[in-house]
Amino acid sequence: ALADREEEGAVHLDIAPNQRYRVRDDHGEALPESEGGAPDKRMIRNIEQAGYEHGGFVRGYTSTVRWRFAKDMTGIGDESELLKSYSKRTQWSIKRARSMGVHVREIGVDELDTFARIEQQTAERRHFEFRGPQYFKQFAQCFGERARFVLAEIDTAEYQRSMQRKADDLRALVDGLEAKIAQRETTKLRRRLNEESSNLAAANKRLAEANELVEKGDLIPAAASMFVLGPREVVYLFSGSVEEYKPFYASALIQHEAMLRYCVQGVEPFGHVNLYDFYGIDGIFDDPDDEGRGVLEFKQGFNGYGGGRW
């Protein structure tokens, strides 16, 4: 009780219950009460009766996460259903990542320096606090198997082979079109040749980039995330990415693999988990220039819902 804290010499005490006040759709609109969108005013009354004062609702990033984005995993039974639940753009991003040789795996404490390095690069780029490698090692020690660190890497040889196949296929297509035009040119064939020639030039450029990437190593870290597992929800708590490898969509693939492994397929002892918590957003849905817009749009692509906390 609040009186107990006063007896212990507390000057000020803040509490932030992990309780939704109101469920909103992925664009911030409150759901109808018939769909569970009614505000939970009872919790405020209970806390006020205990002697606390509600500090009001705020938007923006604060020291305590006040807005979260989550996805209901109920009824999603396999990877195909999971993929179909995303936006078309996000589905494309995940398929694109796989076609470019990106693979996702869990890492242990012995590789946390790689995780921390990516996290630090992201913190410096996006101007948030970096907690340091020791923090993550202590987190892993405290949470044990419930803390999962995930790394997305580019298999450069696989990427090179994929780009070579695409360039070869386009080269064959262009050669075939040129042969047809040599026999009898039509406007349709010429237009198709121009289009595929442009695609071939782009494919050759990507192949040249893949050849350069091979020189950097066999496996190149592109993104990393940390998750906390529980029986009721899986929480996506920390993440980072290497800006240079943004076109590989590694972060999107990590999210998909996490939902698939930890929620749909489930791990012992939790099994299937019905809630995937993308964690913090700033609660600003209507400003395209907001600093948190990119984070929001990334999470919206997985078709979840937003909600304000106390």
Question: Model regions: which residues?
Answer:
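Acyl-donor binding region in acyl/amide transferases
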Residues: 1-61, 175, 222, 229-304
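A conserved beta-strand-loop-helix scaffold within acyl/acetyltransferase catalytic domains
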Residues: 20-22, 26, 34-40, 50-247, ...
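Short, polar N-cap/turn motifs at the start of nucleic acid-interacting alpha helices
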Residues: 305-309
